[in-house]
A protein has these predicted regions:
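Conserved CoA-thioester-binding segment of acyl-CoA-metabolizing enzymes
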Residues: 1-41, 57, 260-269
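Hydrophobic alpha-helical membrane-association signature
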Residues: 16-19, 76, 222
Length: 269
């Protein structure tokens, strides 16, 4: 997926949110697509929210596209990242340039985040008189730790790829001309030897473990998943292929063969 408003440094709009969510829906429904890579067109990944409305950019009374729920207007960045959170396939962000505001926070639900040498990251919300968006107050501390998350959000300072790597915001730095090819290689490593349904369940198990209060909660889900997967054709193929020293050919499909207990969480998004 390519954020494709290079003339605006891929500034984020409600339409971009809708198109990204539609793309995630389509990719998830297509069993031939095993992972998604997201990058930006041109020299930026995403320069943040489109500020063409000037001082009224963040004023809810000027938001003609608001999605409202109960007594609040839902943040469009959060609607997007919650869709990513529920996604059933690996998400890789290949950050090709500056990523500011929502450009930085939208990457946090990614399973792997890599960046070019030209990338920069800035959680600049407090500098604009607002607060972190896109569920980043939940994601960011879990990725970089609470003290570093507060440092980045209080100050709004822009960090380069090297510091992003040092604090585990990204996992690797790449030459700009190699970024997408390297992201594809990483995606292939993630998916080529593993069963798609096992990846889907594992992704949700690990991300949702942050909301569990006791390891017993994880034990319950793992037990159900092991029983379900252990009786599947994929498990038989996994064992047989190992014993026969050949690559596995997993046939169970996300579109039709997810276990009965899935999803196990209350969906309030």
């Amino acid at each position: 997926l390519l954020l494709n408003r290079p003339e605006k440094l891929n500034a984020f709009t409600f339409l971009m949110m809708e198109e990204l969510i539609s793309a995630f829906d389509a990719i998830e429904a297509d069993d031939n697509l095993k992972a998604v890579i997201i990058s930006g067109a041109g020299r930026a990944f995403c320069a943040g929210a489109d500020l063409s409305s000037g001082k009224d950019t963040f004023n809810p009374s000027f938001d003609n596209f608001a999605v409202k729920q109960d007594d609040f207007r839902r943040d469009s960045g959060g609607i997007l990242t919650l869709r990513m959170y529920k996604f059933l396939k690996p998400i890789i962000f290949a950050c090709n340039g500056p990523a500011v505001g929502i450009g930085a926070s939208m990457q946090l639900p990614g399973d792997i985040r890599i960046a070019s040498e030209d990338a920069r990251f800035g959680f600049v919300f407090n500098n604009r008189g607002i607060v972190p968006d896109a569920c980043s107050s939940w994601f960011l501390p879990k990725i970089v730790g609470i003290s570093k998350a507060l440092d980045l959000t209080f100050s709004g300072r822009i960090i380069e790829s090297k510091e992003a790597l040092d604090i585990s915001l990204i996992s690797s730095i790449h030459k700009p001309e190699n970024l997408i090819d390297d992201a594809i290689k990483i995606a292939q490593e993630l998916i080529e030897k593993s069963a798609p349904i096992s990846i889907a369940i594992t992704r949700q198990m690990l991300w949702r473990s942050f909301g569990q209060s006791d390891p017993y909660d994880a034990h319950v889900i793992e037990s159900k998943a092991i029983d379900s997967r252990g009786a599947s054709d994929d498990a038989k193929e996994g064992v047989n292929s190992f014993l026969e020293k050949r690559p596995a050919k997993f046939k169970n499909l996300i579109s039709s063969d997810m276990p009965d207990f899935f999803p196990w969480w209350d969906d309030n998004a």
